[in-house]
A protein has these predicted regions:
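Positively charged n-region of N-terminal signal peptides that target proteins for export
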Residues: 1-5
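Flexible, low-complexity junctional segments that flank or bridge functional domains
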Residues: 22-292, 299, 323, 373
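Hydrophobic alpha-helical membrane context
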Residues: 15, 100-102, 308
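A generic, residue-level signal for flexible/boundary positions that often mark functional hotspots
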Residues: 8-10, 201, 368
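N-terminal hydrophobic alpha-helix used for membrane targeting or insertion
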Residues: 6-7, 285
Length: 389
């Protein structure tokens, strides 16, 4: 995974001053869609691998016809739905500010004062401000008069439709965006009414949006509050080690029974290359009385896939670790992009055991993180350009 902002997109970013479009003036949005489709067809290897071209073009025609009567949020969600029809986990429209310098903020939707997480048995409240702390641990059964399952399904249409694990990881964050909920018929105005259940007892809660300046760390936290906010509680009594913050992009630790290697991005560090870092972890694990290594990729959203060989070859050559029961790899729905390429290589070339959730993407997938910014609405859109297998 890499990040590339197209030349035209960069010009839009530098000149962006915040363009507001009147509800009936759909021409800027028509132009945004035209330019995005030009970029998509020029740079994506196969934009119709998931959705047949005829279906894709029909959806575009329906969106164009509806544009004059749509609100800004409805225009954004409609656009996002078209982008998501491409299907791959590297082609989608973020609903939150991307953590890259020089990009406009995106939709700028206000967020709820609680955080959700989607589990196998439903959507739960896992973080909340002190005022909503009584909601922690409750299962969400509805948004307004819409069942939670239907609400999740509506939002899933805005996320990569072929990369379902990736979509299931991020759908909880999308469900926190108040204007998005209103656009999808899941909220009325700036108030969101949730139906909740715990221990067989049901209740409702009316929630208002946070101030526009409140920003969550969408990428690497699942239950934290807005950045800088101290007024926050989580459902978990203790944060597990793998979710605890650490400096840099990687760490090596000694756990009971194994050396532990975790990285959140596959990249060279300031003082150490990726190859040097992973070689140090392998050497440390080999030096144990009973050599064992755990590689934790549960928070790794990708990086530079060309660096994977440094770890794979080090393990392939290790007689102490490259055997059954000595090497374990942990994965999750956030194991994405170049990290999926690493998982595939480890599966093919080592004796690693894999534990956890299925990865965000398929082993064969469209990748590269290119970022295009629409010229009028200033919405960053991520799109793939290469096929990896």
């Amino acid at each position: 995974m890499s990040r590339l902002v197209t030349t035209s997109a960069l010009a839009f970013v530098l000149s962006f001053g915040g363009t507001a479009c009147a509800k009936n003036d759909d021409a800027p949005w028509q132009e945004d869609l035209n330019v995005f489709l030009e970029v998509l067809h020029a740079e994506h290897d196969n934009p119709y691998f998931h959705t047949p071209r005829a279906d894709f073009e029909l959806a575009i025609a329906d969106y164009r016809a509806a544009l004059p009567g749509l609100s800004r949020a409805e225009r954004i969600t409609g656009f996002a739905r078209i982008v998501a029809m491409v299907g791959d986990g590297h082609t989608w429209m973020p609903m939150y500010r991307l953590p890259f310098d020089g990009l406009p903020p995106g939709p700028g939707f206000a967020s709820l004062p609680i955080r959700f997480e989607l589990f196998d048995d439903g959507l739960y409240v896992v973080g909340a401000s002190h005022a909503q702390a009584d909601l922690l641990g409750t299962r969400v059964t509805g948004f307004g008069d819409v069942p939670a399952e239907e609400a999740v399904a509506r939002v899933m249409e805005l996320l990569p439709q072929d990369a379902t694990n990736f979509a299931r990881e991020f759908v909880a964050e999308w469900l926190m965006q108040v204007e998005l909920l209103e656009a999808l018929g899941l909220a009325a105005g700036d108030k969101v009414t949730l139906s909740l259940e715990r221990g067989g007892e049901s209740r409702t809660a009316d929630l208002a949006a946070l101030d526009a300046g409140a920003m969550y760390n969408w990428v690497f936290s699942m239950d934290d509050g807005p950045m800088g906010q101290q007024d926050w509680q989580t459902a978990a009594e203790q944060q597990p080690f793998w979710l605890q913050a650490f400096d840099g992009h990687s760490r090596i630790a000694e756990l009971e029974g194994a050396t532990y290697l975790q990285f959140t991005e596959i990249r060279d560090g300031e003082d150490q290359t990726f190859a040097e870092m992973v070689r140090a972890a392998v050497t440390q694990a080999e030096a144990r009385d009973e050599p064992a290594l755990i590689i934790d990729l549960r928070r790794c959203l990708g990086g530079d896939g060309t660096l994977n060989e440094g770890l794979v070859s080090a393990l392939e050559e290790s007689d102490a670790l490259n055997r059954d029961g000595r090497l374990m790899v942990l994965t999750s729905r956030s194991t994405h992009s170049a990290a999926v390429m690493l998982v595939s290589a480890l599966e093919q070339r080592t004796a690693a055991r894999f534990v956890g959730q299925a990865t965000a993407d398929r082993p064969n997938h469209y990748g590269e993180t290119n970022i295009f910014v629409t010229p009028n609405s200033a919405l960053p859109i991520i799109h793939a350009s290469e096929y990896y297998q």
